């Protein structure tokens, strides 16, 4: 169901957002205003994009802070217990690593999208994919991995109901980050020589591959 939602809903949504970004060539706050005709009020949706991105930033900066915290703990050799409850109950730890995340993000973005974010993510995403492949292979050799993979991949059609379908739809839109203007930003950097449909298919294929590998890592 999730894969069907990606194909039926995800591809059109991505192509739409890519096309808006490529046509407007500006930030999500102003892209609707730039493309609207006189008398139309589509520009108000730019403010929804801004508020949505602020909400996402409030969420992801905290999670990134947790990742940096665990990386520091790993370097210190403290691998016996994750201590998640103790970590999230400490305001000083959370605020400190949140600030570290914000400082790192501002430093990277100071070099603009192509000179900063694109250059960094090119190496980080490649390293993450290699790491996930290694962890997935390791998980397949764990005891009981066969039962875990059966639970992960064997469908149970008796569990399908309205809430499952809605959940699959929500996950499809969430995992593709559509509706907040983020994909429109990337669309503004897609040249006319590239097919928006092809770019959308590439994004969905890689996103699905990463999601599948994450499941292989977790369930066994």
Placement of each model-derived feature along the sequence:
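Extracellular loop-to-transmembrane helix junctions
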Residues: 1-17, 93-94
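Membrane-interface alpha-helices at helix entry/exit sites of multi-pass transporters
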Residues: 1-2, 41-48, 81-82, 194-203
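Hydrophobic alpha-helical transmembrane segments of multi-pass membrane proteins
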Residues: 3-8, 48-59, 100-107, 120, ...
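Membrane-embedded alpha-helical segments of transport systems
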Residues: 4-12, 51-61, 205-217
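Hydrophobic/aromatic residues in alpha-helical transmembrane segments
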Residues: 16, 64, 113, 182-185
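Inter-helical loop and helix-membrane interface segments of multi-pass membrane transporters/permeases
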Residues: 23-48, 61-116, 143-167
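Helical transmembrane-bundle signal
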Residues: 53, 60-70, 102, 128, ...
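Membrane-embedded translocation segments of transport machinery
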Residues: 118, 122-220
């Amino acid at each position: 169901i999730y894969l069907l939602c990606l194909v039926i809903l995800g591809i059109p949504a991505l192509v739409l957002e890519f096309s808006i970004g490529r046509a407007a060539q500006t930030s999500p706050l102003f892209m609707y205003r730039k493309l609207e005709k006189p008398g139309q009020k589509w520009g108000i949706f730019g403010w929804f994009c801004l508020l949505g991105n602020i909400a996402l930033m409030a969420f992801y900066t905290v999670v990134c802070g947790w990742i940096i915290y665990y990386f520091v703990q790993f370097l210190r050799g403290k691998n016996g217990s994750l201590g998640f409850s103790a970590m999230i109950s400490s305001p000083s730890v959370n605020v400190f690593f949140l600030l570290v995340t914000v400082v790192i993000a501002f430093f990277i973005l100071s070099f603009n999208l192509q000179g900063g974010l694109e250059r960094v993510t090119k190496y980080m995403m490649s390293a993450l994919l290699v790491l996930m492949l290694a962890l997935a292979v390791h998980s397949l050799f764990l005891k009981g991995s066969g039962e875990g993979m059966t639970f992960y991949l064997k469908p149970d059609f008796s569990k399908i109901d309205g809430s499952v379908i809605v959940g699959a739809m929500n996950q499809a839109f969430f995992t593709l980050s559509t509706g907040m203007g983020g994909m429109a930003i990337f669309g503004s950097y897609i040249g006319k020589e590239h097919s928006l449909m092809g770019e959308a298919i590439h994004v969905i294929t890689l996103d699905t591959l990463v999601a599948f590998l994450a499941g292989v890592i977790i369930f066994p």
